[in-house]
């Protein structure tokens, strides 16, 4: 369309379209706006628009049109690169650069876009060496030395454009070239040109740093070059020979450390460069924007590592020099808010990047000064962070800086190889004390005090906390806990005295209130402020205690930290074991009132202080003072007890070289202390579930503590000896209050705990009695409900629905309790229910919550048990799952979803069904069952001879689900991704099953792959492309010339061919598309040749015809026909990269 018009008509049309796009929404309608957008799109896709674009740039006065002309040049240069003469490209680049130089008043966004076009031309030319940066650098150098701020700013813009374009494939222009192409350009650029840019930048910074007074214009130039230096020092240097798969991963790393090549040695190891950046920072530190850049430059220099250092000596010299510069910059000054994060990043980088042996090799007095400075800053930033919280600031700069410094401490103190024991103790004491002080109320602490020491505002109630402090501050607490360990001598007694004192005060407050109530019922004169302060103090003291005494362990065996064990052993000669046990076993008494209390084990006394808090809470509930208690404190206590139980209770001597006698006596196997604690903890659980049943989070933490008590067989053996345990089991089985008021998720976990307890060691009669009391009532009540003659009439009554829901939740809990040694009993028990659950699907088909929960039962059973089941049991489960899916499909197929809620309900169901099918599929590669041996004692019978695999079941399941997958449902990203992951998974693992599918299912599956490839997100498209390779390979193996799969693969060859050659696609997909394309070409060589021939014969332009023909010949240049050989495939993929660089986008023009 544009090609037929003269230049002046084109300009008129573009300016008119720009006017529409720039007009306010009230002045133009949608249709006009879309037409205007189409005009620009059409213009940018026009063939060889260079002459008309130059004319536009020279004559048009409309900025937006100038911007579009620059964009059109940039896109066309890349698209038509192989058609252009090198001299034309060079003159185009010169024209653009000259254009900008001659028009200093161009709008910023127009100038940046023209310079981006220059950068793209330079980048595209860098690989075939047709264009280099030398002449540009010469011009830039002249602009810099002109001393004209406008010209210097322009020079900076040119360098910035080059830097952005070459820096990474994520920031680069979307010019349709591969990751490998961007990587190659970047490597060429970073060795020479990047260093030149840095040297030019350093020149400017040196000149400006020498000047006394800078006017606003000069400050602006200075700031731009400082930002440019920051960009260079933050360059993510690409290592040599990094494959395309890793380039994206490498470049996505957030915190880039400075790791330049050897060629930078002379530049960056020059001490004057480092000194310059310290000088610059001192000069501009009060300007918060510039300070950010100067500190970031220093942080990057603090992370310098890699081949740039020739030996250790050079590293030591560099580090010592840097620390001297840092200390002289920050000692004796008041740090600005805007500096806090930057300074903490510098320190963090020094500690993280430089190896310990280098850190310890610098002069010892310098290292001591550095650690003292770190201590001072940590305490200072901690106080400022506490202040930020009080003032509820949005931008928590000190909190971020404090977190960074605490992480640095963690890195330092965990190294006992280079620093002798006790090296950091005094520093740890200071940081620990400061942390505790900031978290306690006045007068002992400074919590909620503003800078001038005034209490800020009425404390919000502790239980109103939006996000739990444990989650919010877990990293901080872990660091402070570790510092507390290395200074155990100081920190454990400190925590004990603070906690004991506050728990005693809390007890006193509650007692006074009780007496007031007895004296005058109805009067309520308690001071809530005092209570709130006490609760908040106890909250923080318990959190720190929990992190100091034990680690977070996910899936590992938790061990008592070595520092705590050593501390207890060191003390043990002066410890009276009996007094220690007396304090542990008397939570109702003040520790200080017990004779000889000072000769107790300090760690056990600290644990006793938490038990004392727990006891005060329990007594208050018995005295009807629950309304005065803090659920948050209840949560903290249970969290601590769970964390502590995992690590200390029934301590396993085999795991330790040496063990503390007090620990062994108090918490070891077969000890009175251990029996007492388990009884106490169980009592606490039962009390909490009764008192706090309405506090969901607290009840949840409580049942998690119960699971911890029984998940290890040794502990469970002691738990089941408690009468309370049996009472709890009976009470729950009878659904009597208050347990029946617990939320469904809490009931589910409680069921899990009760089932785990049932596998403790007991004689067969006792075990039989236990299952009779725990599982049988569940089965009995369930059957009583569903077998009533009028069940269909009463099934929707609230009471009945609650009974059904409670049973389904309990079944999920039973499944969650599965272990290899209990799976036989649990599977047989659950299978009886699964059949009945399928019947419930019919009854409750209009009740989405119940349907969802029924599917969830199946998901849990498959997830937890399938890997242990032998063939016959697996078949039973497969059949039950398939029946479930058939019933679900029958009830939902063709059903009209009237509202959004109904659609979301089905989305939830299908997401669970996908999970169920994926769990079943896992049987094919995670199978712990050799035979059905584990089941024989429980159910005699032979496995069937049908060799049905999980894949058959899953494919049948997909057949049932596929018709339910509407286009609307696939708009839910998580469901769409889960669905395509599942079918790709099936194609990759069982390609041989696909040709054997029923015709309808086969067609649906192929349609799904095509839909995913052409109409879904790039992630889904990639999954579908990955599914094609194994399917094509399966065809090649089968050598069946007449199969529907082969016909489908021919169709996909055309789709992938079009995607690669004719359509603009995401370059990240080129690899997956290339691999699929190669396999499809191997399989359909004649069809591929036909596609190429058809494409070539449709070309009218002889130049494009020839270039395309050459590119295709080069792509399949091998004299031997392509085969499914890895080496040949890799060679093809490399040629495809080049092919895409030369012709990608060439055919996408209008």
Curated annotation (Swiss-Prot):
Gene Ontology terms for molecular function: nuclear export signal receptor activity
Physiological role: Mediates the nuclear export of proteins (cargos) with broad substrate specificity.
GO BP, one annotated term: protein export from nucleus
Localisation: Cytoplasm; Nucleus
One GO location term (cellular component): cytoplasm
InterPro entries: ARM-like, ARM-type_fold, XPO4/7-like
Protein family membership: Belongs to the exportin family.
Entry protein name: Exportin-4
Keywords: Cytoplasm, Nucleus, Protein transport, Transport
């Amino acid at each position: 369309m544009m090609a037929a018009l003269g230049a002046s008509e084109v300009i008129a049309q573009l300016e008119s379209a720009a006017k529409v796009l720039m007009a306010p929404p009230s002045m133009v309608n949608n249709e006009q706006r879309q037409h205007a957008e189409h005009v620009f799109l059409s213009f940018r896709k026009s063939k060889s628009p260079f002459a008309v674009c130059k004319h536009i740039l020279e004559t048009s006065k409309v900025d937006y049109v100038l911007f579009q002309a620059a964009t059109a040049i940039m896109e066309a240069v890349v698209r038509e690169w192989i058609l252009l003469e090198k001299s034309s490209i060079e003159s185009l680049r010169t024209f653009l650069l000259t254009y900008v130089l001659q028009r200093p008043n161009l709008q910023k966004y127009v100038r940046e876009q023209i310079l981006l076009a220059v950068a793209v031309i330079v980048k595209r030319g860098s690989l075939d060496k047709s264009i280099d940066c030398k002449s540009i650098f010469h011009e830039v150098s002249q602009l810099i030395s002109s001393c004209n701020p406008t010209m210097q700013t322009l020079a900076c813009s040119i360098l910035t454009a080059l830097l952005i374009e070459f820096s990474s494939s994520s920031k680069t222009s979307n010019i349709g070239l591969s990751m490998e192409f961007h990587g190659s350009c970047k490597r060429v650029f970073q060795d020479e040109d990047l260093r030149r840019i840095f040297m030019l930048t350093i020149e400017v910074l040196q000149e400006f740093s020498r000047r006394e007074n800078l006017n606003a214009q000069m400050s602006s130039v200075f700031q731009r070059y400082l930002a440019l230096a920051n960009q260079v020092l933050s360059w993510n240097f690409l290592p040599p020979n990094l494959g395309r798969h890793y380039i994206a991963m490498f470049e996505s790393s957030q915190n880039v450390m400075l790791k330049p090549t050897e060629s930078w040695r002379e530049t960056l190891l020059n001490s004057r460069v480092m000194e310059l950046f310290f000088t610059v920072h001192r000069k501009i530190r009060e300007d918060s924007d510039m300070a950010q850049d100067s500190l970031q430059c220093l942080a990057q220099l603090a992370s310098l590592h890699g081949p740039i250092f020739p030996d250790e000596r050079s590293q030591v010299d560099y580090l010592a020099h840097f620390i001297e510069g840092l200390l002289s910059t920050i000692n004796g000054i008041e740090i600005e808010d805007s500096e806090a994060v930057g300074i903490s990043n510098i320190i963090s980088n020094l500690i993280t990047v430089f190896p310990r042996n280098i850190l310890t090799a610098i002069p010892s007095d310098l290292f001591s000064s550095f650690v003292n400075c770190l201590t001072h800053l940590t305490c200072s930033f901690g106080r400022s962070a506490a202040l930020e919280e009080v003032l509820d600031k949005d931008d928590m700069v000190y909190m971020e800086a404090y977190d960074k410094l605490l992480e640095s401490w963690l890195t330092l103190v965990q190294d006992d190889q280079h620093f002798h024991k006790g090296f950091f103790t005094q520093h740890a004491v200071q940081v620990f004390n400061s942390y505790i002080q900031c978290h306690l109320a006045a007068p002992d602490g400074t919590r909620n005090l503003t800078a001038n020491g005034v209490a800020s505002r009425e404390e919000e109630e502790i239980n109103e906390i939006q996000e739990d402090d444990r989650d919010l501050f877990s990293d901080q607490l872990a660091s402070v806990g570790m510092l507390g360990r290395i200074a155990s001598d100081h920190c454990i007694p400190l925590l004990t005295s603070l906690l004991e004192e506050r728990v005693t005060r809390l007890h006193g407050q509650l007692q006074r209130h009780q007496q007031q109530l007895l004296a005058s019922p109805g009067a309520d004169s308690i001071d809530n402020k005092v209570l709130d302060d006490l609760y908040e103090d106890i909250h923080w003291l318990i959190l720190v205690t929990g992190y100091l005494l034990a680690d977070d362990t996910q899936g590992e065996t938790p061990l008592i930290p070595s520092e705590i064990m050593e501390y207890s052993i060191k003390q043990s000669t002066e410890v009276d074991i009996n007094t220690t046990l007396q304090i542990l076993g008397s939570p109702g008494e003040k520790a200080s009132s017990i004779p000889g209390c000072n000769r107790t084990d300090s760690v056990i006394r600290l644990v006793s202080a938490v038990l004392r808090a727990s006891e005060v809470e329990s007594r208050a509930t018995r005295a009807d003072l629950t309304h005065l208690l803090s659920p948050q404190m209840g949560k903290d206590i249970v969290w601590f007890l769970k964390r502590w139980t995992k690590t200390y209770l029934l301590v396993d001597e085999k795991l330790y070289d040496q063990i503390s006698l007090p620990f062994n006596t108090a918490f070891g196997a077969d000890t009175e202390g251990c029996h007492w604690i388990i009884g106490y903890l169980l009592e606490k659980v039962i009390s909490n579930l009764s008192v706090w049943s309405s506090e969901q989070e607290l009840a949840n933490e409580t049942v998690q503590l119960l699971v911890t008590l029984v998940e290890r067989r040794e502990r469970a053996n002691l738990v089941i000896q408690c009468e309370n345990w049996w009472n709890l089991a009976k009470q729950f089985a009878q659904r009597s209050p208050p347990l029946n008021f617990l939320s469904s998720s809490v009931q589910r976990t409680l069921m899990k705990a009760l089932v785990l307890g049932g596998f403790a060691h007991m004689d067969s009669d006792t075990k039989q009695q236990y299952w009779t009391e725990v599982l049988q009532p569940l089965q009995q009540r369930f059957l009583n409900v569903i077998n009533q003659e009028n069940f269909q009439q009463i099934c929707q009554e609230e009471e009945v629905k609650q009974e059904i829901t409670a049973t389904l939740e309990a079944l999920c809990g039973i499944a969650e309790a599965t272990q290899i040694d209990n799976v036989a009993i649990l599977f047989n028990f659950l299978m009886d229910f699964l059949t009945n659950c399928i019947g419930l699907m019919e009854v409750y088909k209009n009740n989405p919550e119940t349907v969802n929960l029924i599917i969830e039962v199946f998901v849990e059973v498959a997830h937890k048990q399938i890997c242990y089941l032998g063939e016959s049991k697996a078949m039973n489960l497969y059949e039950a799952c398939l029946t479930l899916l058939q019933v679900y499909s029958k009830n939902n197929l063709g059903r009209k979803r009237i509202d959004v809620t109904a659609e979301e309900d089905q989305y939830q169901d299908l997401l669970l069904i996908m999970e169920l099918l994926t769990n079943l599929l896992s049987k094919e590669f995670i199978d712990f069952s050799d035979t059905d041996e584990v089941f024989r004692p429980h159910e005699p019978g032979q496995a069937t001879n049908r060799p049905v695999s999980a894949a058959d079941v899953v494919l049948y399941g997909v057949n049932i689900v596929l018709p339910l997958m509407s286009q609307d449902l696939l708009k839910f990203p998580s469901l769409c991704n889960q669905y395509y992951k599942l079918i790709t998974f099936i194609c990759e693992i069982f390609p041989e099953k696909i040709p054997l599918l029923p015709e309808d299912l086969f067609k649906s599956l192929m349609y799904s792959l095509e839909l995913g490839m052409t109409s879904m997100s790039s992630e889904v498209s990639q999954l579908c492309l990955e599914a094609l390779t194994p399917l094509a390979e399966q065809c090649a193996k089968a050598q069946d010339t007449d199969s529907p799969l082969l016909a489908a693969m021919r169709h996909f060859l055309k789709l992938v061919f079009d995607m690669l050659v004719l359509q603009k696609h995401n370059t990240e997909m080129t690899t997956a598309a290339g691999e699929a394309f190669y396999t499809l070409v191997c399989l359909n060589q004649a069809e591929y040749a036909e596609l190429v021939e058809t494409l070539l014969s449709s070309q009218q332009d002889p130049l494009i015809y020839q270039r395309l023909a050459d590119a295709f010949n080069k792509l399949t240049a091998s004299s031997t026909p392509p085969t499914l050989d890895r080496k040949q495939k890799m060679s093809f993929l490399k040629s495809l990269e080049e092919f895409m660089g030369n012709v990608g986008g060439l055919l996408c023009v209008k």
